[in-house]
Amino acid sequence: ESGQKEVFIDLEEEIIYEQYLETHLGDILANQSSSEDQKAEIFSKVSTNVVKDSFETSLGLGTMDYDTLRRTQSLVKNALIFIAETHSLKALSKMIGHDYKTYEHATKVLWFTVAFLRKNPDILEQIEPTYLTFDETQKKELLKQCGVGAILHDIGKAFVSQDILNKNGPLTTIEWEMIKRHPLNGLAMLLDSECPVFVKKAVLHHHEDFNGSGYPMGLDGQNIHILARVLRIVDVFDAMTSRRPYKEAMSPTMVAQIMIGIPPEKIKNE
C-alpha cells in the first residue's frame, strides 16, 4: 500500500520467515486473496529451500534421514493440490526458461512429472502394478511418491561439487565420471529410507536409455523402470528449456518438436 517494492531483513529474520512459509504452505496456496503468480513464487521458494536442505543434510549424513524425507513428502502433498489447478500450472510455467540450477531443476521436474502422470493415468498405473485395486486414494498416494522420486531424482549430485555442476565449458573425463556416479550415489542415500522400491529404482535408472547407451548400468528396454523413463523425458525437457552458461533457453514448443524427432530407440514413445 505504501508503494515500497523492497524491504531488507536480516538473516535470522529471513530464516524465521522461510520456516513460516514452509509450515503454512498449504494455507498460503489455498488463500484466495493472493494471486496465482504470488503463490507460484512462494511455492518455488519453499520447494527450492527444501531440496537444498535435502541435499546438504543427506551429504552430511550420507543418507536420507526421517525428518528430511517427511519435509519432502509434505512439500509434494501441497504441490499435488496446487498443481491440480490449470491456472496454477500456468503461473508455474512462467518460470520455464530461467537458469538451470540443481535445486530449481528438481522443483521443475516435480511439476512436469506430476502433470505428465495426471495426463497419462495408464502410465501411472504401471508404476506400481502390485496394487490389487487402483482407487482414488491409492492413486493420490502413488502420485505423491512419484513426486518424491521426481524431486529427489538428482539427490546423488550432493556429492558433486558446484564448480563441476555449474562449469561453463566441457567437462574433463574425470569430472564426467563423477557426474555419471550420481544415480548410484542417489540410490545409496535413499537405500535405508522409507521410500518405496520403485522410487529408488527411478533414482538409479533415470539416466538409462532405451537402447542401452545410458548410465550408470547400461540398462535397456523394459529393464528400465517406467518412472525412470518418465523422469528421463522430463529431465531432458527441463534441461533444454533452461538457460545455461553456454546456451540460451529453447522454447517449450521447439523442444517438444525436437524430442518427438528423437529416435525411438533412445527414449521409446512414452
Predicted feature residues:
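A general structural signal for well-ordered secondary-structure junctions
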Residues: K5-E6, L89, L152, N185, ...
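Divalent-cation-assisted or electrostatically stabilized phosphate/pyrophosphate-binding catalytic cores
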Residues: N166-M189, F210-E270
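Acidic/His-rich, divalent-metal-binding segments that scaffold phosphate/diphosphate chemistry
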Residues: S34-K180, L187-E194
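Terminal helices and disordered tails flanking the catalytic cores of nucleotide-processing hydrolases
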Residues: E1-T63, R70-Q73, F82, T86, ...
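Short, internal active-site loops enriched in acidic
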Residues: D99, H206-F210
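Acidic/histidine metal-binding catalytic segments
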Residues: D122-V148, L190-H206, I224-I233, E248-M254, ...
